[in-house]
Amino acid sequence: MAIFDIEKDELLRLSDIQLEELIARLAEAEVAMHGHSPACVNWSGSITAPDGGIDIHVQVPIDQLKAGFLVRPDTVFQAKKHKMPKSAIEREIGTGKALSPIISEQARKQGSYIIVSLGDDCSPSGKKDRLKAMRDAVKDDPNESYLHLDFYDRSKLIQWLRQHPSVMLWVKAKLGQGYSGWQPYGAWSNPPQGVIDTLISAPGVTITLPSGKGQKLKIDEAINPMRALIRSTNKAVRITGLSGVGKTRIVQALFDETVGTDALDRTVAIYVDTGYEPVPSATAMLDNLLAEGRRAIMILDNCPSELHASLASKVSAAGKEVSLITIEYDIRDDKPQTTEVIHIETDGPDVAEQLLIRRFPSIGQNNARRIAEFADGNARVALAIAERVEEGESLALLSDAQLFNRLFEQRNHPDGHLREQAEILSLVYSFSISSPDAATDELEILGVLSGYPKIQLFKAVTKLMERHIVQKRSHWRAI
């Protein structure tokens, strides 16, 4: 089966609320495809209530829409999990003087009313009968000739779903068929559950754009130009910066309508952290999107330089249907003819301090400031230290060396050999622990230089990863 496909009968396993959310997400994607905000779609309430209430309401502020799965700019969707024969249709929308006021209002506004029935998979004659039942029910309304009516069965719903890859990722995840690692728009920076995840725009993080002649912008100054660049270029966009500067959260903000103006279309966003070896691979996913001509913005976090270069060439050659954003801590040999590079860096502790107070409110302002200063604004390091602060403890009198010991030892007994091995591993920018294609064994070379056997260094790497001191990118590791 193709990546962006699903058996239509699998949708029967959706709950009532999931069905309503699916239709809402599809409506948002359809509205966004027409160049309007997904905020034009509203949905809430009980899907099972037979009261003619509105499940999903689309209100696009224009006079006419280009025909598609949405025909009128004002459209009401009624979502039903069960079958909807003629008798059920009449009960749902009423007839004559008992006609639902929702239907009458849609007719008055020359809008559209669509029943989506998951339980039905109609033949052409079956759909015709249901549409006739809907039309007969409204025939006595004075504005009935202005009302657009339609009936979407399971086949129509799956046809609509196939047009929107990001929504397909969502529904597959709900059905337990999600692809390993791939996600639609969401909290990609993975904040702890229950923690506020609004973007921190404090001074201390600067962003340099490729056309900015080296000018360093604040986050709130850079968001809109970043969006404009991603929309206009046919090149891949590479977001670089040291670990802990907030690259992923800033990319997430590009799709957030509450940040800046004219947000990127979140309904076409497809995200994956390549460090977790996704299935399908990033290459296979891009090839599929390009082959099917799907509009998508593909975000690859922790994307190695080699993978970026390979995919950037494909995106540049294909045009603008698929936009590619990759995130990584370095740039290396990215080719300017296929890549726009945006660099993010920290200058000061302010953002890290605010993040600590948000994540660990009991830590106190003074401790948060001390940790952020020690970490030199690096949020990843700051969070690792803050996790080990005891209730009521003060760090004011701890030296930098003592704070480093706390970060490194993490309540384990001091281990001079492990620290020495970490120092050896930190001499290089990064190192490979296993690469069948490599001409040299990098861990073996580091072992020769240090006097430690390769297996001992390998074990050290494993321990350091458990302490979140080593980062992982495929077979690459870095202190």
Describe the predicted segments one by one.
Residues 35-36, 256-268:
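Post-Walker A helix-loop "phosphate-sensing" segment adjacent to the P-loop in P-loop NTPases
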Residues 81, 245-255, 297, 441, ...:
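Short capping/hinge segments at domain boundaries that bridge a core fold to an adjacent linker or tail
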Residues 268-318:
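Conserved P-loop NTPase "ATPase switch" module shared by AAA+ and STAND
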Residues 121-124, 304-311, 315-342:
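Sensor-1/coupling segment of RecA-like P-loop NTPase cores
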Residues 1-204:
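Mixed-charge (Asp/Glu-Lys/Arg
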Residues 239:
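Hydrophobic anchor at the beta1->P-loop junction of P-loop NTPases
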Residues 244, 250-251, 332, 336-340, ...:
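Amphipathic alpha-helical "lid/sensor" segments that cap RecA-like P-loop NTPase cores
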Residues 87, 91-106, 120, 170-224, ...:
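Winged-helix-like regulatory helical subdomains adjacent to P-loop NTPase cores
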